[in-house]
Amino acid sequence: MGQKTSPTGFRTGITLGWQSTWFASKADYGNFLIEDQKIRAYVDKKYNRQMTKAGVAKTEIVRTRNEVKITLHSARPGMIIGPRGGEIDILREELEKMTGRKISVNVIEIKEPDLNAFLIAEALAEQLGKRASFRRTMKLYCEAAMAAGAKGVKIMCGGRLAGAEI
């Protein structure tokens, strides 16, 4: 029987970079790992799960001796930065309060959101939550990705779709 391999773990270091870049002693490693998870969960909850969806597809964390550098890859960076940079300062202060470390936040715009798998999946799930036709919605996102320049698209959707009974 074939064994399933995590695609992220399989590609990390070869075609993908790490999501967190830091080194720690044995005593600090677990604390840093939990801190990274808290930061990612907070950013995801604030910018992807609430009504103001900024489309944060990736959160990179780099730790140096003095500070934690967080890079957010977003489809709509204006939602994160806010007017005159006010929102990003609030985010930085909240993360500093949560972690107790000096934090710098950088926001990078995703040039083609139609080519980002995470953003496509989030948008598709949102449409399915609104009870849209799953075949039409999947076809629409496939065509949008191909029009944006993708070489190929494969979308898999499972569950009890279209009100299918057991």
Predicted regions and their residues:
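RNA-contacting regions in translation and RNA-metabolism proteins
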Residues: M1-I166
